[in-house]
C-alpha cells in the first residue's frame, strides 16, 4: 500500500487540510464528555456552582473565611474581591490560575467554617491560637479526604451564602445549564461540519488517485510489447485496471476518513482518561489488550485467504472471457457441459473463499460489542464504589465511560481497516507490478531515420528468436532481403514461425540474435512510431472497434478525407456492402464487429 502514496503528491495540500480537519473534529468530540460531566456534576448536583469561589459574597462572611486562612492566602482572597457595596463584595476578573488558588484556600476555609457552624461555634469568639490549630488539623485531614468531598462541602457553603443574599439558585442553575448546553451544541456542530468536509475531501482525493492510477495503468499497458501482454494475460489486466483500482480507492477513502482519525481520537481519549484521575485506568488497559488480541487473531486467520481472493477473481474473469470469446466454437463442438463445469468450479472456489473471509469478519463486530458492553458494566461497577467512597462524582464516571468508548471505537475503526487492508494491499501490489514492469521494447536514445536511397528494403541478417521463458528457438539464423517492389511469401507448416517472423518487423517482439534493417537502419535504432508508420500491417484476425464504419476506417489516419476513405473501402472491396446500408459510412459497428459478417 505504501507504494500508492507516491502517486498522491498532487493531493498533498488536500491531505494536510484533511488532517487539520480531523484534529478539529477530534478536539470537538473529546470536549463533549467533559461538558457532559460538568452538566451532571456542576449543573445538576451543584446547582450551577462550579467551585468554592463565589461570584458574590457578604463582607462579614468573607471576613470570617479569611480568619480561617494563612495571612498570605487571606490577602490574596481579599484582593480578588471588590470593596463592599451595601455589604456585598463581588469577584474581580481573574485568571484561571488565580481561581484555582482561590478555590484551594476558600475550599479549606469553608469546610472548617461549616464544621464549626454544625457544632454551634461562633468563629469570631475563637482565639487565634485555636484557629491556627484547627487549620493545621484541617490540612492533615484534607490529605485523607478526597477533593470531591471538599468541593461538595464548599459548594454547599456557597449555596447557603447565595440563599442568604437572596439570590435565585434555580436561575443560577438554569443559566449554567443553558450556557453549557449551547457550548456543547456549538462543539457538536463544529464536529459535524468537520466530518462532512473530511468525507467530501477524502472522497475527492481517493477519486483523484483512482483516476490517475487508471490513466497510468492504461498508458503503461499501451506501451507493453506482446511479451508483457502474454506475461500478465488480458483477463488479469482487466481486473487490475478495474476491480483492483476500485479496492485501492475505497481503502484510501477509509484511510483519510477513519483510519487517520482513529489514532487521533484514541490518543486524545487516553490522555483525557489519565487526566480524570479516577483510579480506573486499569480497565482501559484490559479493554485495549482484549481488542488487540481479537484483531490480531482475525488477521492471522483471514489474511492468507484475502491474498488468494484476487487470484481467484482473475481466474474467473479468464474463464468467463474465454467462454464468451469462443462461444461459437463451444456450440459447434457441443462442449457447453464441460465449460459450465469449468466455470462452476472457479465460481465455487471463489464463493468458498469469500464465505470463509466473511465468516471470519462477522465475528468481529459482535465480539467488539461484547467487549464494549462488558467494559461499560465494569466501569459502572467500579465507579459506583468510588462514588460511594466520595472519591468520584457521577459526571466524572460518565465522562470516563464516554472516553473509554471513544478509545474502543478507535480500535473498531482500525478493525474496519483490517477487513479491507489485506485485499486492497494485494490489489495495490498487483497495480504496482504493472507500473513497475520494465517494457522490453524500448525507444532508442538517439533515433535514426532510414536512408531515402533504399526506400522499401527489408533485410533479415542472421536473425534468431526465442519466446520469453522458452528453451528452444522459434527462428534460427534467418537471412534474406526483401527489396522494394518485391512480394515475399513465407511457406511452412503450422508452428514453423511464419507469424512470428512477421511480428518481429513492427517490433512486437525484439530479436534474440541478429538484426532486422529497414532501408539500412536497424529497427531497434528507429523511433517506434516512425517505424510503424512506415508499415502496413494486416493481422491474422480482423479487429473492429465499437463506433461506426467511418471511425474504424479512420483508425490509422484520423485526418483522412472522405475521398481517401472511399478509396480505402474500394481497395478493401467493402464499398458495395457499405453502400447497401441505410446509414452508409455512419452505420454502427458493435464491439469486435459482431454485427457484420466475417467477410465484411
Task: State the predicted function of each range.
Residues 16-27, 185, 189, 193, ...:
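Generic alpha-helical transmembrane segments of integral inner-membrane proteins
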Residues 1-32, 36-185, 190, 194, ...:
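Membrane-integrated ABC transporters
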Residues 46, 322-325, 341, 388, ...:
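ABC transporter TMD-NBD coupling linker
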Residues 268, 272-289, 293, 299-300, ...:
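Helix-loop-helix
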Residues 44-51, 58-62, 69-70, 122-123, ...:
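Short intracellular "coupling" helices and adjacent cytoplasmic loop segments at the cytosolic face
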Amino acid at each position: 500500500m505504501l507504494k500508492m502514496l507516491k502517486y498522491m503528491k498532487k493531493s498533498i495540500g488536500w491531505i494536510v487540510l484533511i488532517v487539520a480537519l480531523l484534529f478539529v473534529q477530534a478536539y470537538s468530540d473529546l470536549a463533549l464528555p467533559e461538558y457532559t460531566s460538568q452538566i451532571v456534576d456542576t449543573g445538576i448536583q451543584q446547582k450551577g456552582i462550579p467551585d468554592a469561589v463565589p461570584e458574590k459574597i457578604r463582607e462579614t462572611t468573607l471576613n470570617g473565611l479569611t480568619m480561617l486562612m494563612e495571612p498570605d492566602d487571606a490577602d490574596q482572597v481579599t484582593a480578588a474581591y471588590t470593596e463592599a457595596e451595601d455589604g456585598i463584595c463581588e469577584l474581580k476578573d481573574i485568571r484561571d490560575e488565580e481561581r484555582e488558588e482561590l478555590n484551594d484556600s476558600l475550599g479549606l476555609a469553608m469546610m472548617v467554617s461549616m464544621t464549626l457552624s454544625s457544632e454551634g461555634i461562633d468563629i469570631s469568639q475563637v482565639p487565634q491560637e485555636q484557629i491556627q490549630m484547627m487549620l493545621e488539623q484541617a490540612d492533615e485531614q484534607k490529605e485523607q479526604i478526597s477533593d470531591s468531598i471538599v468541593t461538595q462541602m464548599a459548594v454547599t457553603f456557597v449555596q447557603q451564602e447565595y440563599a442568604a443574599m437572596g439570590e435565585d439558585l434555580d436561575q443560577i442553575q438554569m443559566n449554567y445549564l443553558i450556557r453549557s448546553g449551547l457550548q456543547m451544541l456549538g462543539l457538536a456542530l463544529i464536529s459535524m461540519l468537520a466530518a462532512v468536509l473530511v468525507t467530501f475531501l477524502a472522497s475527492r482525493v481517493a477519486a483523484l488517485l483512482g483516476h490517475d492510477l487508471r490513466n497510468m495503468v492504461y498508458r503503461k499497458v499501451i506501451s507493453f510489447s506482446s511479451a508483457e501482454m502474454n506475461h500478465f494475460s488480458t483477463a488479469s489486466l482487466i481486473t487490475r485496471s478495474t476491480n483492483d483500482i476500485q479496492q485501492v480507492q475505497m481503502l484510501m477513502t477509509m484511510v483519510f476518513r477513519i483510519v487517520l482519525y482513529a489514532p487521533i481520537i484514541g490518543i486524545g481519549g487516553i490522555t483525557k482518561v489519565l487526566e480524570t484521575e479516577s483510579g480506573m485506568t486499569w480497565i482501559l488497559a484490559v479493554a485495549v489488550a482484549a481488542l488487540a488480541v481479537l484483531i490480531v487473531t482475525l488477521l492471522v486467520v483471514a489474511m492468507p485467504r484475502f491474498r488468494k481472493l484476487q487470484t481467484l477473481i482473475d481466474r474467473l474473469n479468464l474463464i468467463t472471457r474465454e467462454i464468451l470469446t469462443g462461444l461459437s466454437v463451444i456450440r459447434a463442438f457441443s462442449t457447453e457441459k464441460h465449460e459450465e463445469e469449468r466455470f462452476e468450479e472457479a465460481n465455487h472456489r471463489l464463493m468458498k473463499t469469500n464465505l470463509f473471509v466473511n465468516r471470519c469478519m462477522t465475528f468481529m463486530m459482535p465480539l467488539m460489542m461484547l467487549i464494549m458492553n462488558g467494559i461499560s458494566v465494569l466501569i459502572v461497577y467500579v465507579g459506583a464504589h468510588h462514588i460511594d467512597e466520595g472519591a468520584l462524582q457521577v459526571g466524572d464516571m460518565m465522562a470516563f465511560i464516554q472516553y473509554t468508548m471513544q478509545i474502543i471505537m478507535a480500535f473498531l475503526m482500525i478493525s474496519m481497516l483490517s477487513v479491507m487492508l489485506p485485499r486492497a494491499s494485494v490489489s495495490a501490489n498487483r497495480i504496482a507490478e504493472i507500473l513497475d514492469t520494465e517494457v522490453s521494447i524500448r525507444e532508442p536514445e538517439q533515433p535514426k531515420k532510414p536512408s531515402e536511397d533504399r526506400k522499401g528494403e527489408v533485410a533479415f541478417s542472421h536473425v534468431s528468436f526465442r519466446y520469453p521463458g522458452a528453451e528452444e528457438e522459434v527462428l534460427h539464423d534467418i537471412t534474406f532481403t526483401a527489396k522494394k517492389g518485391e512480394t515475399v511469401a513465407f511457406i511452412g507448416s503450422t508452428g514453423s514461425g511464419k507469424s512470428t517472423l512477421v511480428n518481429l518487423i513492427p517490433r512486437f517482439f525484439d530479436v534474440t540474435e541478429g538484426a532486422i534493417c529497414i532501408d539500412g537502419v536497424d529497427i531497434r535504432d528507429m523511433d517506434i512510431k516512425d517505424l510503424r508508420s512506415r508499415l502496413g500491417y494486416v493481422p491474422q484476425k480482423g479487429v473492429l472497434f465499437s463506433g461506426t464504419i467511418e471511425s474504424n476506417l479512420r483508425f490509422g489516419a484520423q485526418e483522412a478525407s472522405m475521398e481517401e476513405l472511399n478509396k480505402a473501402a474500394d481497395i478493401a472491396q467493402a464499398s458495395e456492402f457499405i453502400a447497401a446500408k441505410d446509414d452508409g459510412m455512419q452505420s454502427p459497428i458493435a464491439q469486435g464487429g459482431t454485427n457484420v459478417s466475417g467477410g465484411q
